[in-house]
């Protein structure tokens, strides 16, 4: 029978927030828990499941890094923690006294341990705070992760290093962020500007 080639699916570019929009979200989060949550998702490029799975033992303040255990693809990785984030996490721990998971829900599990913050709870926090910040883009947890990768590339971090920090198996996945990066050498300009710059002296 006649075999027809499959029609390639349209690939949508990731939604990315500006640094100013990230700042607005941090400023709009009233609860310390939510500020730290957003700071970790964006500041470490975490998936929703990864931020929910953070345990106190995964935080290494001396080495300024977070151990992400068994993330997607079953590969552990380490990501750096900023000094600002470390201060916020310490304040949060001091105020909330979590025992196992960094972010907990309102119920205990069968063994009496703190239950993890629910996926719905994380997404609700991110979406409601983005709206409060006046951001018109459709913001989800992965939007903050996309923004992390894009901003690192714009800051000149090597793409292979970004791949490692994101936990991507294939560098091609990381390269998708190049389509939304505003790299200095890639900014489009009119050739007329070059003519004036060279010839109007």
Locate each region found by the language model.
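Conserved catalytic core of the tyrosine transesterase superfamily
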Residues: 1-201
């Amino acid at each position: 029978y006649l075999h027809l080639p499959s029609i390639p699916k349209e690939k949508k570019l990731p939604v990315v927030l500006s640094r100013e929009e990230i700042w607005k979200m941090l400023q709009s989060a009233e609860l310390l828990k939510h500020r730290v949550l957003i700071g970790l998702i964006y500041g470490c490029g975490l998936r929703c499941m990864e931020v929910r799975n953070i345990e106190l033992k995964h935080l290494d303040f001396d080495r300024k890094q977070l151990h992400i255990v068994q993330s997607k693809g079953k590969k552990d990785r380490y990501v750096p923690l900023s000094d600002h984030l470390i201060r916020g996490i310490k304040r949060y721990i001091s105020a909330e006294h979590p025992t196992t998971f960094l972010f907990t829900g309102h119920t205990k599990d069968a063994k009496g341990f703190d239950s993890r913050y629910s996926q719905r709870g994380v997404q609700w926090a991110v979406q409601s705070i983005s709206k409060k910040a006046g951001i018109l883009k459709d913001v989800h947890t992965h939007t903050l992760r996309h923004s992390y990768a894009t901003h690192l590339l714009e800051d000149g971090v090597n793409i292979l290093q970004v791949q490692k920090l994101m936990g991507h198996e294939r560098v091609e996945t990381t390269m998708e962020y190049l389509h939304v990066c505003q790299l200095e050498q890639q900014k489009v300009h009119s050739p007329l500007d070059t003519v004036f710059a060279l010839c109007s002296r």
